[in-house]
Amino acid sequence: MVAAASVVVAVGTATGILSALGDDGGGADEARPEVTRSPRLESLPVLPSPSPSPSASATPSPSASVKKASPSPSPKPRKRSGKSGQEAPRTTPAATRLYLHPRSQVLDWVRAHPDDPRQDVIASRIADRPAAVWFADYTPATITSRVRAVTSGGAAEGRVPVVVPYAIPDRDCGGHSQGGAPDLDAYDDWIDRFAAGLGSGDVIVVLEPDSVAQADCLPAGERADRFASLSRAGRVLKDANPNARVYFDAGHSGWHAPAKQAGWLKQAGAASAASSDGIFSNVSNFHATADEVAYDRAVLDALGGPASLGAVIDTSRNGNGAPSGGEWCDPDGRKLGRAPTLSTGLGRVDAFLWVKLPGESDGCKGKPGTFTPSYAYDLAR
């Protein structure tokens, strides 16, 4: 999801993602990283003003490797389920606090190192804050139970979990985060199973990072098929749980122009209340919050759709904005951004989220996707 003006870099946003895994089929979730690279999304300081933050770098994130996507053959036309009728505008969830999933690498480290001098800082500033749970492995047989383990945990505490389905075919354009379902028919089935685990409580779904912003690596026909599957996915998720809030990929402020991104989002169903509650941006990146706020509002304006559509922003590592030069791999000098919250105080901004868990390496300060305490401490202190 790292892209510069006219150059899209085939690097995924999911470096160091946490996947809820559980091979026992019983839904026991263990947050575990996928060994993938995430594109750099730059975090922005959260300011009530939509104007760009002066500290934010406009430089797009650099490419780790410009790898041409090797898209799979276009799938044959398929029947798509999911209602297309309009739904009433969403309302604010009854739950007002985000859910902290009890299993993650950072929590494991904190529990295992009570005497480490960095433990208090890492525990209080990272481990104790809610972060998204990623589902990046294509495992149809267990996906329902694993999603249910997270959503039921949130419901039991009266809190809102954040889940990230990340299994679209040809994800990351065949780059470092490649993987996902073998084809769109299989993906549609996987999403049906994912939706079956959402339950009936409040939940935020960050639907397929990179899937829209990075779609220009696909031929036009395959891009249209992907967008049709994403639109269907949004409808299926919201049909399964009317309290689910589904957000679509808007890239980040250093990537596509708002009008271009909005055009693709519209094709993917993001302008319809039947499938969408809005957009997300800055996943795994570092762009300043103020820049993302301004960008997201511009995208929403260009997108049209119901006035209820809003944006959620990944603020996990954007406390100092993006580094000069567009470095994306564990750049020095970055800090934690705004704490996760559903109360931003900003119009059209529904939440600040930690979609990327701070301290999980992009691959330069530790193995890709693994929790690295020295990196976490640098971000948090």
Residue ranges and their predicted role:
Residues M1-V7:
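N-terminal export and membrane-targeting signals
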Residues V9-S19:
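Hydrophobic alpha-helical membrane-insertion segments, chiefly the h-region
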Residues A20-Q119, H176:
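N-terminal low-complexity, Pro/Thr-rich disordered segments
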Residues T91-R193, G197, L357, S361, ...:
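N-terminal carbohydrate-binding/catalytic regions of secreted carbohydrate-active enzymes
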Residues A94-P102, A132-V133, P161-V163, V203-L207, ...:
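Hydrophobic faces of well-ordered beta-strands that scaffold small-molecule active sites
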Residues D108, A112-I126, W255-S374:
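Surface-exposed substrate-engagement region within the catalytic domains
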Residues A131-Y138, S177-P182, V212-R223, Y247-G254, ...:
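Surface-exposed cleft-lining segments at the edges of enzyme active sites
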Residues A149-V246, A262-W264, S275:
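Substrate-binding cleft of extracellular glycoside hydrolase catalytic domains
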